[in-house]
Every structure is written in C-alpha cells, then in structure tokens.
A protein has these predicted regions:
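Short, well-ordered loop/turn elements at secondary-structure boundaries
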Residues: 55, 67-69, 92-94, 103-106
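Histidine-centered divalent-metal-coordination microenvironment in nucleic-acid enzymes
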Residues: 73-74, 96-112
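Helical (often loop-to-helix) elements that flank the catalytic cores of nucleotide-handling enzymes
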Residues: 83-92, 112
Length: 112
C-alpha cells in the first residue's frame, strides 16, 4: 500500500461525497480566509494525492453510509502552542491521539 492509499484508508468515511476548501485570501498572520464546500463525488486517490502535494484542500466525511464514524479531529487554534509539551501530555496520559501541527501554526489531534 502506497502512502496515498494508507492516508485514504485512515480517513475513510462517506463514499458519496467529500469536502473541498479553496483559499480566498490571507485573513491574518498564519491564518487564511477560505471557502469550504461539499462536492457530491467520491474522494479519489488522485484528489488525496493533490491534497498531500499541497495543490488542493480536501477532506473526507468521517460518517459513512451506515452512520459509523471512523475518525475525529480536534483543531487547536493556539498559535503560541508548545507542540512538544502537548505531545508529552498526550503520551503521559496514554491518549489514543495523533498530533500534527496545522498549516496555521496550531495543532490537530486525530482519533482513529
């Protein structure tokens, strides 16, 4: 399984649609003004590859056709966040979370 296939398998969900985001303008330091919308077509490997390459903002809908939720995310918009300290807290508490820095400088915590 290549990295794109692994990524799409982690973020699986509803097969009939996906989200897309188009950046409109810089809103403030670190944050961009964007328009997000639903595209009523499946999320494909090509779309995910474009997302991973930084060409397109896409997202899967985490609730599938059977109402099963496959993942969740917390968006932390604290731009002075000490990512190392947060990582250590997650590890010390043995929380089943994956920590990633967001583009704007905050963080995302994913639960699978």
């Amino acid at each position: 399984m290549n990295p794109t296939e692994r990524f799409i398998s982690l973020f699986k969900g509803y097969n009939g649609a996906h989200g897309q985001t188009t950046v409109i303008d810089n809103h403030r330091e670190g944050k961009k003004k964007a328009k997000s919308f639903i595209v009523r077509e499946p999320l494909t490997l090509d779309l995910v590859q474009d997302h991973l390459d930084g060409k397109l903002g896409v997202g899967s809908i985490p609730i599938d056709e059977t109402n099963c939720c496959w993942f969740g995310a917390l968006d932390i918009d604290d731009y002075n966040l000490d990512l190392v300290s947060l990582y250590k807290k997650v590890e010390n508490l043995k929380l089943p979370l994956v920590l990633c820095r967001s583009k704007s400088g905050g963080a995302h915590l994913f639960l699978f």
